[in-house]
Structure formats: structure tokens, C-alpha cells
């Protein structure tokens, strides 16, 4: 019995194996709206007398099978890293010799660990990211950590001749057929995006011998995390012990601002109503300025651009970041010099911009997503010389919906063993 390993696994058909695969690779994703039907996703199909399943599900290979490995192995002259790894990073590099996922909170150093693995395995490598900001950040890290220039796919460039190529997924998608056999290793940054159609289809075409996923959270609010690792491996996941990070203190800030409990009003409209209250704007500004005066470097986040722009008005030592910022190094310099407060969009700061000096996170609009909240808190947990112990300002609102969301966030804080205290604003 022969099993082919390529972009996917190709196994000889048998009714018993087909039933087992159907049972395990049929995923029911609960509906997010009340009354809506769940989504059923199947990631297997039959081609004549062959069953095709994702490459990560090698647990379905029958014992005693002959393995025919058609994955591509493309040796490359990757230099040693110009960096000293911390113990848990070195542990990951020593451990990983095959498809793997590194699940570590922001501050661990997933980028340098991944590049150390690229150096170890010495394969022509494709690094996949989902934003231009992340792509540019990886370019700088490859230059700094390995001392070489990577190729770029995106922004009008299609440079596939370099030993390391960095591509944003939107540009990669249209070239996936051409690229499927050109890389011996693929690194997927923020691999929890893999269930997205473009990510999934690209990963499913690549025949790379080694696949490495990086993530700060393996949970998705939409429930699709149940199958996302099938394209890399759902079994070999490295979760390092927490090091090089600071545990934040959670400050619950009670307010009298209401959030409607009406099921007829869309959530987006409820948040728009909240951020349109003039006094709410004033309170957020005062909190940010007060924490900055204590010596904190403040990150105040929301998903409302106009709200963030309004918050930044009249505060001399602040900066509004709601889109791609030209250079992370410039942001770091300004935080050291003249900027104490950043009013930033959640979409930008949950992934992609890491500024070690940040020490205070203000949740300027409520968050009901544990994965997103974990990512945002990670932005203030990195160690940095002269940095105050990090704090999270979590505003408390009136209403049953607000209380349920607050309880969900508290559960996350307790699970992380964060110190929590509530201000008395009487």
C-alpha cells in the first residue's frame, strides 16, 4: 500500500478509511448569529481510488504503508543568525525538525526563532504574512538577524530568486500555481488566519518539505480554529514557558456609560453610539493623559477611526496610528523622544506592530474576543529598560450585554493569573 506525500496526502481508498476520515475531517462550525445555520466544512475528497486529505493529517496513514515523498526539498545557503537565542528559543530550534507550530504570546520572539530554524534547515524559504506592515517588518528582521536581503512578492515586485522570499497573502494567491514547487520551507506568520480562503488554498498547493506556523493564539472567535492546523500539523505544537515578559495589572474603571441591550440594534451601531458621547471622549483623554504623566507609554485602542482621531486632537504628545506606519523604528524613536500616547486602531496593533516601550493599554471600546485581547495585551508585556510595570485599563459599562462581556474578559484575566483591582470612582 503506497501513500503519497505532496501538497496533500494521497491515500489508497478503502471504505473503512473513508468513514474514519469523514468522521474526523467533517467540521461543524456553530453559527455566530442566533437562528442561523451552522457551517459544515469537509476537507477531504476522493479521486478515483484515492483519498486526498491535508498534509498535516499524517495520523491517517495506515501502518506499514510505503511512503512516496514528492514534497520539494530545495537546499539554500542560509547564513547563521547574528543573534543569541534565549533558552526557550534555543529549545524550540533544537526540537523542531519537521512540520511544527510555535504558539507563543507576543514578546517571545517568534520571528527570530523562525529565522533560526530557517538557518538550521537551510531550505529556500517562503514567508507568508497577511499585511504589508508585517511584510515590511519581516524584511527588516531578515536583514538584521541573518544579514541578507530577502526577495519580495507584493507591491509590484515578484522576486523569487532569493533564498528567502517574503510575500503578503493577497499577492501570493494569484501566483500560487507558479510557486507551488519553488520552496523547500514555508513559514506562515499569524497562522490562525489559515482558515481564510486565500490562506487555506495557498497552503494547500505548496509542496514544501517543511511547514512552520507561528501564532500568538490558536483560538478564533468564529470557531474555525478546529481545522486550521490541518494544513501544517495539529499535533506538533511548541508552547514555550513565559519568559522575557511582564505580567500586567488589570485596572477596572467603572463608568456610567450605557451599552444598549436591544437585540434589534447591530453591535457596530451600539459602539458608534458610545463613542459619540462627548463626555466619553473626555474621560478616555483624561485617563490617557493621567497615565502618561505617571511615566507610562500609553496605547489607547479602538476600532473606530474617527473616534481615535478625535481623541488625538489637542494632545501635543500623542500620535494617531490607524493605518500602515512607514517605519517601526521611527515609532520606537518617537516613543523615546516626544510621544507618550498612541491612539491606535485595533486592526493595526493586534498584530504587526510591536513597540517594547509601551506599558499601558487602554481598551477605549469594549472587546469580546479573547484571542484579540490576548494579542493586544501582549503589546505592553515586552521587557524594556526603564519601563513601568504594565497595566490594562478596562472600562466597565452599564447594561446586561456589557456585564456579560466584562465577565468574559475577567475570566481571561483570572486564567492568566493577572492581578486585578477595581477603581472606586465615587
Whereabouts are the PLM-identified features?
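Interdomain "pre-motor" coupling segment immediately N-terminal to P-loop NTPase/helicase cores
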Residues: 22-71
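Conserved pre-motif I regulatory segment
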Residues: 67-103
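Walker A/P-loop
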Residues: 98-121, 126
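Conserved interdomain hinge at the start of the Helicase C-terminal
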Residues: 118, 262-303, 309-313
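Conserved helicase ATPase core of P-loop NTP-dependent helicases/translocases
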Residues: 136, 140, 149-161, 174, ...
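Conserved helix/coil segment N-terminal to the catalytic DExD/H
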Residues: 155-185, 196-201, 348
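Conserved RecA-like P-loop NTPase helicase motor core
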Residues: 173, 323-416
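Post-DEXD/H (motif II) to motif III coupling segment of the RecA-like Helicase ATP-binding lobe
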Residues: 184-185, 192-249, 413
Amino acid at each position: 500500500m503506497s501513500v503519497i506525500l505532496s501538497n496533500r496526502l494521497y491515500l489508497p481508498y478503502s471504505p473503512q478509511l473513508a468513514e474514519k476520515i469523514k468522521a474526523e475531517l467533517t467540521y461543524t462550525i456553530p453559527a455566530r448569529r442566533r437562528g442561523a445555520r451552522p457551517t459544515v466544512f469537509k476537507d477531504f475528497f476522493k479521486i478515483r481510488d484515492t483519498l486526498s486529505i491535508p498534509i498535516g493529517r499524517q495520523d491517517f496513514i495506515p501502518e506499514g504503508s510505503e511512503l512516496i515523498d514528492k514534497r520539494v526539498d530545495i537546499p539554500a545557503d542560509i547564513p547563521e543568525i547574528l543573534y543569541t537565542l534565549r533558552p526557550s528559543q534555543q529549545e524550540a530550534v533544537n526540537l523542531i525538525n519537521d512540520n511544527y507550530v510555535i504558539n507563543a504570546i507576543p514578546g517571545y520572539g517568534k520571528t527570530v526563532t523562525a529565522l533560526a530554524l530557517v538557518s538550521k534547515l537551510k531550505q529556500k524559504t517562503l514567508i507568508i504574512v497577511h499585511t504589508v506592515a508585517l511584510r515590511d517588518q519581516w524584511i527588516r528582521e531578515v536583514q538584521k538577524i541573518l544579514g541578507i536581503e530577502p526577495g519580495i512578492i507584493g507591491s509590484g515586485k515578484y522576486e523569487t530568486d532569493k533564498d528567502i522570499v517574503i510575500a503578503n497573502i493577497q499577492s501570493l494567491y494569484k501566483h500560487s500555481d507558479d510557486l507551488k514547487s519553488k520552496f523547500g520551507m514555508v513559514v506562515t506568520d499569524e497562522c490562525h488566519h489559515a482558515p481564510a480562503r486565500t490562506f487555506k488554498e495557498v497552503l494547500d498547493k505548496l509542496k514544501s518539505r517543511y511547514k512552520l506556523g507561528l501564532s500568538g493564539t490558536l483560538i478564533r472567535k468564529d470557531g474555525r480554529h478546529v481545522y486550521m492546523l490541518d494544513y501544517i500539523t495539529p499535533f506538533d505544537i511548541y508552547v514555550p514557558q513565559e519568559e522575557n515578559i511582564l505580567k500586567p495589572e488589570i485596572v477596572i474603571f467603572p463608568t456610567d456609560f450605557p451599552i444598549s441591550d436591544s437585540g434589534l440594534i447591530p453591535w457596530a451601531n451600539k459602539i458608534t453610539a458610545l463613542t459619540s458621547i462627548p463626555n466619553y471622549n473626555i474621560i478616555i483623554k483624561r485617563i490617557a493623559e493621567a497615565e502618561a504623566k505617571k511615566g507610562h507609554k500609553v496605547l489607547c485602542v479602538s476600532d473606530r477611526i474617527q473616534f481615535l482621531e478625535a481623541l488625538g486632537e489637542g494632545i501635543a504628545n500623542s500620535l494617531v496610528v490607524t493605518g500602515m506606519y512607514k517605519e517601526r523604528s521611527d515609532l520606537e524613536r518617537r516613543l523615546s523622544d516626544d510621544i507618550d500616547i498612541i491612539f491606535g486602531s485595533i486592526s493595526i496593533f493586534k498584530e504587526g506592530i510591536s513597540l517594547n516601550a509601551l506599558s499601558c493599554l487602554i481598551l477605549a471600546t469594549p472587546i469580546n474576543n479573547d484571542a484579540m485581547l490576548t494579542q493586544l495585551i501582549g503589546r505592553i508585556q515586552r521587557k524594556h529598560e526603564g519601563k513601568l510595570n504594565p497595566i490594562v485599563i478596562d472600562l466597565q459599562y452599564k447594561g446586561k450585554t456589557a456585564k456579560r462581556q466584562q465577565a468574559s474578559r475577567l475570566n481571561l484575566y483570572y486564567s492568566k493569573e493577572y492581578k486585578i483591582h477595581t477603581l472606586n470612582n465615587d
